[in-house]
Every structure is written in C-alpha cells, then in structure tokens.
A protein has these predicted regions:
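Short glycine-/acidic-enriched loop or helix-start segments at secondary-structure transitions
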Residues: 41, 96, 179-181
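A short linear-motif detector with a strong N-terminal bias
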Residues: 7-12, 93-96, 145-150
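Glycine-rich nucleophile elbow surrounding the catalytic serine of serine-hydrolase chemistry
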Residues: 89-101
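Surface cap/lid and interfacial helix-loop subdomains adjacent to catalytic sites
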Residues: 45-46, 56-83, 101-188
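Glycine-rich, mobile lid/loop segments that gate access to catalytic sites or pores
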Residues: 85-87
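Active-site machinery of serine-nucleophile hydrolases
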Residues: 1-76
Length: 188
C-alpha cells in the first residue's frame, strides 16, 4: 500500500499531476520503486547470520532492477528526450543522486538535465565500504563515494563530470524515517 499512496500523492499533488499550471504535466513520468535498502545501487545477493544463528538472504538488486525497468520502458517511450529530470525524495533521493549520471547516459545524454534530490542526508563513515562489500555497486558509482555523505559525494562527482547539469539538493530534519536511521547510525 505504501507505493500506492506515494504514487497517488505524486499524481494528485506532485510533479505527476495534470493541473494546467504544472510545467511537467505533459512529461513522461517513470517511477522507480525503492524497496531493498541499497539506494538503487546494488548488484549483490548476500547471506547474513543473526546473533541467534539464523540466516537471512538479502537481495541487493536495486541497480539491476532499475536498469531492467528503464530499458524495458524504452520499448514504449522515446529514449532520447530533449529534457530529463532525475528526482527522488527521502530514500529515493539517494538513488537519484547515485544514479543520475547513469540515467543521463541511458537517456542518450539530453542537453537539458536537472537533478533534484529532496531530503536525502545520512552521515555514515563507511559508505564506500558498504557500496563495495555489501551492495557490490557498479565501480563508477562506488568510486566517487569517499566521504561520509553519499549524496554529496555523488552530486559533486556529477557536477565535476557534467558541469551543464542543474543540481538541486534540499534537505529537512522532518523526514522521520531518515532521522531515525541517523540516530541508529550514530548510536547503534
């Protein structure tokens, strides 16, 4: 139901609504659901052992899922738009930052690109190690993340590579889930 609520909200009040004043009302909208904890950057399946000895398999397949979805959609839409907006909020904003360069290439390098990341800030010292060891993120993505801010590192690398891309990054402490995640990162 969470995806349905989010899809409804985007369609009714967000960038996907059909209101006359919405400058994006005639755009094609592709929603990539976020669901497995790897910010759309994983290509790995990993088994973990809990403290009680039980094992669990986690499928960090976010990058693979995103690529399959977008390339399949190209059967139905133009893969070379004049303009491209890559955006996401909360956990999805991490994916927007990390995948922006990849998405630009997938859409054949449009001339007018904007990347908007909304409320995607988590400070963690070992993001690079997570991308390498846990998620097995593509090299081009993980190699730009060297600090404690995965979003900022990804956006700075995007700007250094593509100076013409417009980058917007806004953040709020009102995202309860991200605030809780940061407390967990900080205090365990």
């Amino acid at each position: 139901t969470g995806l349905n609520v989010m899809t409804y909200a985007i369609k009714e009040w967000g960038i996907g609504n059909s209101a006359e004043e919405n400058i994006l009302k005639d755009w094609t909208f592709i929603g990539v659901p976020y669901c497995n904890g790897d910010f759309h950057a994983g290509t790995n399946t990993k088994e973990y052992t809990a403290l009680d000895g039980r094992t669990k398999t986690i499928y960090y397949e976010g990058y693979n899922n995103y690529r399959k979805l977008v390339t399949k959609i190209f059967d139905y839409i133009n893969d070379s738009p004049e303009q491209l907006l890559v955006t996401g909020s909360s956990a999805g904003g991490f994916g927007a930052a990390i995948l922006a360069d990849d998405a630009i290439e997938l859409f054949n390098n449009p001339q007018d690109v904007t990347v908007h990341v909304d409320s995607s800030l988590l400070i963690k010292e070992d993001w690079h190690d997570v991308m390498v060891e846990e998620w097995k993120s593509p090299k081009a993505m993980r190699d730009v993340v060297m600090g404690d801010n995965i979003t900022l590192d990804s956006l700075v690398a995007l700007h250094q590579k593509r100076t013409d891309v417009k980058i917007l990054f806004d953040c709020s402490v009102r995202d309860f889930n991200l605030s809780q995640a940061q407390v967990f990162f900080d205090n365990g």
